[in-house]
Amino acid sequence: KSSIKLDGSPNFNDRVEIGPTELAFDEWVKAGIEIPNLKKMREFRVNRLIKELNKRDLDGVLVFDPLNIRYITDTTNMQLWNSHNPFRACFISNEGYIILWDYKGLNLLSSFNPLVKEVRNSASMFYFANGDKRKSDAQKFALEIKDILIGKNKGTHRLAVDKIQIHGLRALESQGLEIHDGEEVMERTRSIKGEEEIKAMKCAIHSCEMGMYEMKKHCLPGKTENDIWAVLHSENIKRGGEWIETRLLASGQRTNPWFQECGPRIIQNNEILAFDTDLIGCYGICVDISRTWFIGDKVNITPKQKELYTEAYLQIKENTSIIKPGMNIKELVFGGRELPKKYEELRYSCKMHGVGLCDEWPLVQYPIDYVDGAFDAILEPGMVLCVEAYIGEEGGFEGIKLEDQVLITETG
């Protein structure tokens, strides 16, 4: 067999690097889906970030958010635990020099990526790990960052930082560093996907849809919501996916209002089931699509169910149809299909949003929620948007949730 997998990663059974399983690869090949080249995808991401740093005249960006670390290094380490225990960090200079702070300073989980030039220890400054010495530990880390900037001849010390503990921010500022908003830098950088990222997303979506196909087989009266949701989890992991961000699956009258979490409710005959995948799948790519299914043996759905579903479908279809490069966000907010007044109270939190490694910038609000100046941006090819709709009346019995993930191309 080949020593290289179809995505260019090592075909070595005992490798450390995570990734898609053979089941996923086989399904992609059968479906005729192009598989990404991970080396090219990683290089695109780093080069795009370098460009954005230089556009802002920044010396570099320091990130703690595990998804921003993933974007820069394509490495993982206990992603969910890390999301609330920030023991990792990553610095990239405006020339592309990458330093990763990881557990014990080990390159165990990053040696596969030659773009990571150094691995260091001790970026922690949170209470669980550092206790009442976190302030002094933050000062040590800040000195290290200053030394890095001096060593890179970064005389201006203009550093972007995304999400840092309060002692860390104070320590960096005490060293005379000029701190800028790293979250803005990373969100805007991540908003444009390269060719290989788009291939990776298509693969992730296909794997999610295969999981949904298996999930639908288990959608039977007498099953609990958790029974059904567990199938999506299982099928995601089987294919090399990573986790699910939310618990947005509900049945029957629990579909109204939306945002009730998946639980032990037993699904009855002739009910609807609505869910939002919010799934972090293969390659760490987010697949964020929503569907509402009918469960039971009745031939015809009720007139009310048809009314709700039709409106949700038309919201998705018509709002998607207006998307094209060159539009500004405000045009999307006030364009497309108007939401009927009777559904306004329970409207979803947005009409659309970006997506990549998770739900991402930009957010497209409903006109009633619009805040002038909050999301000033022009749509560009390579952006991916999720178009959403929740249709349900206040005090109503049921609601319908639909959502599609769409790529903006040169033509639409």
Name each region found by the language model.
Residues 1-412:
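Active-site neighborhoods and metal-handling regions in enzymes and metal-associated proteins
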